[in-house]
Every structure is written in structure tokens, then in C-alpha cells.
Amino acid sequence: MSLRHQITAVVLAAASSLCVAAEGRLSVHVLDQQTGTPAADVHVTLEARTDGTWHTIARGATDTDGRIKALLQADQPLAAGDYRVTFHTGDYFRVHNTATFFPEVPVVFHVQDAAQHYHIPLLLSPFGFSTYRGS
């Protein structure tokens, strides 16, 4: 990966952490570190854990900017508890004719304050990824 692509990925990641999606309680942003561009059309599943079992509560796909601004709509309840957002990355890489070691990236997180907005950026490459709690 060229230095220019690395710098672009870092700048995009920083920008994503500054953006708060007022439309929903949960947003995601996927950036392709190999190309330094947003990852469009990555399918994402959101699940909640109830009594030790995962239940799907929302699905979506990233837009041309690599974002889902409201994976969970503002009027949908977000209770305190454990959640899992799974980024289905295999199809994204397949469309781009790129082999990947990670066909999906599950991110488990805990909600303490249901009134807050939660943002989960994913920095993605074919053989690695990084995520964190954005704002």
C-alpha cells in the first residue's frame, strides 16, 4: 500500500470519528485501507444478545461514502446490553476481485447508556482490520 493510500485511510478514519449521525442511534463507517477509499455496499447485520442467544434486529448496506448513518433508527429501542454488528466483507472483496482472509468481521460491543449515539468505524484490508468506538 502506498504512503498516499495510508494517509488517505487515516484522514478518512479521523473524519469518520468526527461525524455524528443524528438520524439514528447506531451508525457504522467502513474504509478500505488498501485503496484508501470508503467501502461501498458492505452488508451489515446488527444482533442483540438475549439470554445468551443472538437475535437479528437490523440489516443494512454501506452507501457510496462507506456509511450506514442509521443502522438502528432513532425510534427503535436500544436497551443496555450486548450487541454484535457483523460486517459481511467477503462479498465486498469478491466484487473487487480481491482474496481475503476475513469473509466477515463480527464486532461485539456493550451498551451502557441507551440514550447515547454509538458509531463503529471499521478500517478494512484483505488480511487485517481495526475498529474502535467512534463518536
Name what the model sees in each region.
Residues 2-3, 80-135:
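Feature of secretome-associated and extracellular-like proteins
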Residues 5-39, 54, 130-135:
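Beta-strand-rich domain onsets/edges
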Residues 21, 50-53, 75-77:
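Short, glycine- and charge-enriched coil/turn segments that flank and shape catalytic ligand pockets
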Residues 22, 38-40, 79-81, 116:
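Short loop/turn segments at connectors of secondary-structure elements within structured domains
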Residues 34, 50-52, 91:
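Solvent-exposed strand-loop boundary residues in beta-sheet-rich modules
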Residues 42-46:
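Hydrophobic beta-strand segments
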Residues 52-71:
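Short, acidic Ser/Thr/Gly-rich low-complexity loop/linker segments typical of extracellular
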Residues 69-81:
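Short Pro-Gly-centered beta-turn/loop motif in secreted/extracellular proteins
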